[in-house]
Amino acid sequence: DEGNGGVLTWVRLSIHEAIDFYHHYKEDIAFFAEMGFKCYRFSIAWSRIYPNGFDEEPNEDGLQFYEAVIDECRKYGMEPLVTIVHFDVPQACIKRFGSWKSREMIDCYLKYCRTIFNRYKRKVRYWLTFNEINMILKHPFLAAGILFE
């Protein structure tokens, strides 16, 4: 929820803090550079850009955070490879639309994509649309926020 972001499905399901990338990305990226990484794949959390997934305006704090991550990668000569959706549909979209069961999600997704493409177009060359989209069949809620009655 930091940086004025919304709630993700994973936030509610996690039982621990993990690596706390939000506060330690500079050290993490420096370690990656020390190990010789030339590319760093990471995800942009949709709800950090549009807290509810369907907000009128993007969250500038979230946009600035990812810009700082991208700039840190570039500082060390690493190519950022950005995943647009990595099992992190905003929870408000699940409640309002039923996630991807509703075609209304397409407009929300396209708005999110346009926002990040326009913001980072001079800094990011490689984009992945969905992480492991096939996982929707095995884990519909975790992969896409889809609940079945």
Regions found by a protein language model. Give the residues of each.
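Aromatic- and Gly/Pro-rich amphipathic surface segment
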Residues: 1-30
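Active-site region of glycoside hydrolase catalytic domains
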Residues: 1-9, 33-34, 52-54, 63-149
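Generic serine detector
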Residues: 14, 39, 43, 47, ...
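Residue-level marker of alpha-helix boundaries and capping positions
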Residues: 19, 57-60
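Catalytic domains of carbohydrate-active enzymes, especially glycoside hydrolases
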Residues: 20, 24-45, 79
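Short, flexible active-site loop motifs that bind/organize anionic cofactors or intermediates
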Residues: 22, 53-56
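General structural concept
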Residues: 39-46, 50-51, 59-69
